[in-house]
Regions:
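N-terminal intrinsically disordered/low-complexity leader segments
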Residues: 1-21, 85-92, 225-240
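Hydrophobic/aromatic-rich alpha-helical bundle segments in the mid-to-C-terminal region
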Residues: 14, 117-124, 138-148, 161-214, ...
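Helix-turn-helix
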Residues: 25, 33-67, 71-75
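Short helix-capping/turn signature of helix-turn-helix
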Residues: 39, 62, 128-134
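Hydrophobic alpha-helical connector segments
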Residues: 84-123, 173, 177-180, 208
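Secondary-structure edge/capping motif, primarily at the C-terminal ends of alpha-helices
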Residues: 87, 131, 191-195
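Short alpha-helical scaffolding segments that buttress acidic/His motifs in well-ordered protein cores
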Residues: 105, 109, 126-131, 180, ...
Length: 240
């Protein structure tokens, strides 16, 4: 027979978030809402509901929707950097690094939404929404891309040319980098709805290998240099 003490429900202590933790939680929740509705289609009421807080608490951390959106932009740039990408970015500019970076970039863009992280999916949708609105979020994000990814790809193109691994090309090194980034982004957009818009008649591994070859050839890398540096099966370990 249970005593009164035994029958009493156990009350678990409520974990309260610090001000900084609460601010970060609001930003993470806002990322999903903004990615689904865009800036103009998102209300503070919807943001508060997603974050599980009151609108008053939202305004305690952010004076307005614009400030929350700006904070989210900064957070997106931070979240995009991870240990894996940092290892790739730390490599010295070379033909080998160029091949690794292009494989890494395209492999990430070809991950189906169902297999990607929630944050990654929200970021991609947010970029797509931004292109349909004023483009401000996309511009800020692309400045981050230019400072890191594009600058490193450009340096690798120049290093590969110096090593004799590039064909003569009238296309500037920086534009070669940007065009490959745009190509990879379009591959991502094709997958974004969950069911690809265009279904390629190739396995995921074959799609990746073909896309990497296409990108590297377009950048001007000689076929013999690609064959020497690119081992798709070994490179798959980068994104396994």
């Amino acid at each position: 027979m249970l005593t009164c003490v035994e029958a009493m429900p156990i009350k678990h202590p409520i974990t309260r978030l610090s001000a900084e933790e609460r601010r970060e939680a609001i930003i993470r929740a806002a990322l999903k809402v903004f990615s689904e509705n865009g800036f103009h289609g998102t209300t503070t009421k919807a943001l508060a509901k997603a974050a599980g807080v009151s609108e008053a608490l939202i305004f305690r951390h952010f004076p307005g929707k614009e400030e929350l959106y700006a904070a989210m932009q900064t957070e997106c740039c931070r979240l995009k950097s991870n240990e894996e990408s940092e290892r790739v970015m730390s490599l010295d500019p070379s033909t080998s690094t160029l091949v690794i970076m292009v494989h890494f970039l395209i492999a990430k863009m070809l991950i189906p939404p169902k297999d990607a992280s929630g944050i990654e999916n929200s970021l991609h949708r947010l970029l797509a929404q931004s292109f349909m609105e004023d483009g401000e979020f996309a511009r800020q994000f692309m400045r981050h891309v230019a400072d890191e990814l594009i600058a490193k790809l450009e340096a690798c193109v120049k290093a590969a040319a110096k090593a004799g691994d590039m064909i003569d090309s009238p296309v500037r090194p920086d534009l070669r980098a940007w065009f490959v980034e745009h190509f990879a982004a379009m591959l991502m957009l094709n997958q974004l709805p969950g069911e690809p818009i265009v279904v390629f008649k190739a396995s995921p591994a074959a799609q990746l290998e073909q896309a990497v070859w296409f990108a590297l050839l377009g950048m001007g890398l000689k076929p013999e240099a690609i064959r020497r540096q690119y081992n798709p099966k070994a490179f798959a370990l980068l994104t396994a």
